[in-house]
Amino acid sequence: MDLKKAVAFLCEKLQVVETDIFKIEQIHSGFTNFSFFCELKDHSKFQIRLSRKDVILDRRNEQIILQLVEPFFSNPFVYFDVTTGNAIKRWIEGTQPKRATDLFLCRLVESLKKVHSVDWKPFANELLIFDPLVYFEKTKLSAFYKRLYLNLTKKHIDIPKTLCHHDATFDNLVWTPKKQVILIDFEWSCVDNPYYEIANIIREELTIETANKLIDIYGGLKRKLVFETVIYVLLFAFQWTEIMPQTEAILNYRKWVEKRLEYFLKALFPSIWKQAQKNS
């Protein structure tokens, strides 16, 4: 992404001129957005988000969710284009954690439970309700994994639904100097259930040992179902990579998803792994 586009966007929306900018740099090239850090000469700091045009997201859904979670995390956005997803938000000081300490996991759970406590039902007609079969008809998963996936989705039918961040990986949060977890980037957020939320963090970030700590800290979850949901989420992630633009980054991510699937199946569900190999 051309840095000049970020500069022009910032100047237009904040009504500043280029000479007001002290520093600007690209900090992230994600699957859906390009992100830039900018500091003005008056020391105010911002993050600029420019959306990829080849990935369509429901930005109205994101906008509503930002309003719903504002009492917990405030709303850092100073400009938000609900049509394009392009945005500018105040910079939140902090880092992404290098490892999941017990304190970090506790603070992460506290933040997740705030999201899960939100009364979303008044907005039920506007919010995205997670559909695990949204990509299923197009997937190239093997017949064995298709059957497994369908069986796993059925286990979630009767689980009470909550608002979920749905992508609370370490890239999508800030670990502040005050040792608090601020959740950011709600663009994939939707109504689902805490099992998916916790499983998605596990499949992206954690070893089985640390995953067990997270499950214990959250409390009230059936351990086996959480790890079954990890498999379910990994199979969903594989399907997601199939419908995204087939860039090198997406293809590499798919390989990583396959490695994580192998890791969890071999360690926790060896009989399923053996069946998968026989049917591959």
Swiss-Prot record:
A Gene Ontology BP annotation from the UniProt entry: phosphatidylethanolamine biosynthetic process
Cellular component GO terms, alphabetical: cytoplasm
Gene3D superfamilies in the cross-refs: 3.90.1200.10, Phosphorylase Kinase, domain 1
InterPro entries xrefs: Aminoglycoside_PTrfase, Kinase-like_dom_sf
Molecular function per GO: ethanolamine kinase activity
PANTHER family in UniProt: CHOLINE/ETHANOALAMINE KINASE, ETHANOLAMINE KINASE
Protein name: Uncharacterized protein MG356
